[in-house]
Amino acid sequence: MLEHIGLEHEKVQVNPMKAKKQLPSAPEWTKVPVWVEADGEIITDSTPIMKHIDAKYNGGSLWNSEDDARRDKWLEWADLHMSKATIPILYGSMFSALKTTTRVSKLEKFGFISKRLYAWAGFPIMWGIIARSRVKKDGRKPKQLWHDLLSEFTDSFGDAEFFGGKSPDLVDLVAFGYMRSISPYPQFSQLTDHEAGMAWYRAIEATLKV
């Protein structure tokens, strides 16, 4: 969203090992992302943040739709299904979980000890407690789950390039955000052979002002 509309902002990294210290104590600030306006206004969770930014800084153009029911249906679908599919592909096996936590520790601004604690203590928690149960509950391998979701989503475009038609709308950017969250990790290679999904993903990337 921010890169798509070219909005200047300050990005603050949060070390998950120190989240309680780095995030304010308000109950709603228990996880990232959090958007804080210059006047102190706070918005939490990805989709509400994107709606807020679009309305305040982009004239609400990404939220505008000729079919509100279709937009609302697929926005809920993305938040429900794509969001839950990120954990299984990143942490669905012990090896995947280790690769992910190791990669996170290298990407983020952790201290020497925090990097190693997160990489080696984090992966059994994410795999054993969270991801494994989601994979078991769904029954599909993470790659198949993502391919099925990408097929379902891109089929909804009809003959258009984007869900929003000739240009991306908020639903496109929400779905793109979930898929992009996997891109820094080796597991993203499991998605690159989905032709329609990658064509849409690259088309969204081309709109980013970076």
Model region roles, listed by residue range:
Residues 80-199:
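GST-like fold's C-terminal all-alpha helical module
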Residues 1-114:
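GST-like domain detector, emphasizing the conserved glutathione-binding G-site
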Residues 50, 54, 72-75, 147-150, ...:
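Non-transmembrane alpha-helical segments in soluble domains
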Residues 197-210:
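C-terminal active-site "lid" helix and adjoining low-complexity regulatory extension at the edge
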